[in-house]
Amino acid sequence: MKVRTSVKPICDKCKVIKRNGIVRIICTNPKHKQRQG
């Protein structure tokens, strides 16, 4: 899980999800997991 100010999808399988006001990226590749913070 990477915590970044600007989250961007890295590959085609990355999905942007908003949960409780937190922007997250979920992917099949665990390295691509990100959240805004």
Swiss-Prot record:
The similarity comment for this entry is: Belongs to the bacterial ribosomal protein bL36 family.
Q: Which Gene Ontology MF annotations are present?
A: structural constituent of ribosome
**What is the protein's given name?**
Large ribosomal subunit protein bL36
Gene Ontology terms: cellular component:
cytoplasm; ribonucleoprotein complex; ribosome
Q: Does the keyword Ribonucleoprotein apply?
A: yes
Origin organism is Treponema denticola (strain ATCC 35405 / DSM 14222 / CIP 103919 / JCM 8153 / KCTC 15104)
Keywords for the protein's UniProt record, in alphabetical order: Ribonucleoprotein, Ribosomal protein
Cross-referenced InterPro entries: Ribosomal_bL36, Ribosomal_bL36_sp
Report whether Nuclease shows up as a keyword of the record.
no
Gene Ontology biological-process entries:
translation
**Which HAMAP family does the UniProt record give?**
Ribosomal_bL36
